[in-house]
Amino acid sequence: MAEDHPSVDLDTHLSSPRESEESAPKKNRQFYRKKVCRFCTQKLLADYKDPDTLRRFITERGKILPRRITGTCAKHQRRVALEVKRSRAVALLPFVLTE
């Protein structure tokens, strides 16, 4: 009996695509410094009455920046978000910047 399809080596088809990616040479990634929490290192507290400090944690549009961008720890990121919202409520920071 003749087979209609050629024989297939099962070992080559079972290998995952990750194995071939791992064996490929790694591309040069830019080295970045680990971001550290300013509040932990300098023993500071976020305060709604200090809009200049809080402006570092919001975008030009007024959105609160995430932890992965600012480098703050989870505890202080929650505090920053709360203080930004308080500062907006008493009109020290704008909700949205107008042009």
Curated annotation (Swiss-Prot):
GO terms for biological process: translation. Keywords: Ribonucleoprotein, Ribosomal protein, RNA-binding, rRNA-binding. Gene3D superfamilies: Ribosomal protein S18 (4.10.640.10). GO terms for cellular component: cytosolic small ribosomal subunit. It comes from the Bacteria. GO terms for molecular function: small ribosomal subunit rRNA binding; structural constituent of ribosome. Binds as a heterodimer with protein bS6 to the central domain of the 16S rRNA, where it helps stabilize the platform of the 30S subunit. HAMAP family: Ribosomal_bS18. This is Small ribosomal subunit protein bS18.
